[in-house]
Amino acid sequence: MNFILKSLGVLFILLTLFAYTRKEDIVSAYNNLTTLKQVITTVPLEAQYTLGGEVISMDQFDLRERMERELLINAYHHATTIQHIKLANRYFPTIEKILKENNVPEDFKYLAVAESSLRNSTSSAGAKGIWQFMSNTFKEMNYEISDDVDERYHLEKSTQAACDYLNRLYKRFGSWVSVAAAYNTGPTSYAKYLKEQNAENYFDVNVSDETMRYPFRILAIKTIMENPEKFGYHIPEEDKYRPLDDYQLIEVDSTIANLADFAKGEGISYRTLKIYNPWLRSSTLKVNKDARYELKVPVLESESK
């Protein structure tokens, strides 16, 4: 028995030494890492924020916690936030110009980020494009969705549609914060919430979790993207995605049976044609009588790389 106990004791000591040595090795290896290291902390909250020129004070605990939640999520959603900053360099100049022309606050460019991360994505509900329009809403605004064309993917036209829709919501609700909420949940649902709860504004109403978060998500994205370095994001200008503005417009008034052949004739690849014109949804472009389309064609494909 004594032999067994002594053997177990020796084994325990050896295992302890082995474990200690491995721990030291691990700590040493970590300290020598040259990869990204993080300091995880909370995020600073301002006393107030503005959305569309409307002041949102953080003097209520509910508002502070909702804002902090979105700041934390977006500040530490590293890959997505980096891509937001990079893609903004490509798309914001066009979006800002159209917002200004339509008297929509520039802050609403961040709504596009909240909706789609500035990508021509499709939601689980079927909303599409950077501004995430549903097909019925978009068609009602006299924009085209067909087998060959979906203007929800057209940056300029979808942004114009967004401005028309946002201004319509502002005329109805009289507040840009409410506009953001109504854009998310739908104007009919939002108006119903206000009426049923005798609420005068967005901050007094209890809506779905998604809509409770939505304006604060826009605010958080705005806060981080306006001051990325404050949140630890250091993206050199040369690393941002360049605007796709090196093109000429080609007017098309007759059907193109094969867009790949059209692209080749213009000296570009089919892929490049689709990058510059994501609203082209098939390999053909049917042009009805009296219809006209403008295709963006880069001057030289080599210059667009």
Where are these regions (language model features)?
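Short, functionally critical alpha-helical segments immediately adjacent to catalytic or ligand/cofactor-binding
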Residues: 104-119, 179-184, 273-276
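Catalytic and binding regions of secreted/periplasmic enzymes and modules that target cell-wall glycans
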Residues: 166-193
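Extracellular LysM carbohydrate-binding repeats and other cell-envelope/extracellular binding modules
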Residues: 276-305
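Solvent-exposed, acidic/flexible segments
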Residues: 77, 81-92, 101-104, 123-131, ...
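An acidic, Gly/Ser/Thr/Pro-rich helix-cap/linker signature
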Residues: 3-103
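LysM (lysin motif) carbohydrate-binding repeats in extracellular/periplasmic proteins that recognize
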Residues: 259-287
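Primarily a LysM-type cell-wall glycan-binding module
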Residues: 238-267
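Substrate-binding/active-site groove segments that recognize
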Residues: 126-147, 161, 166, 190-193
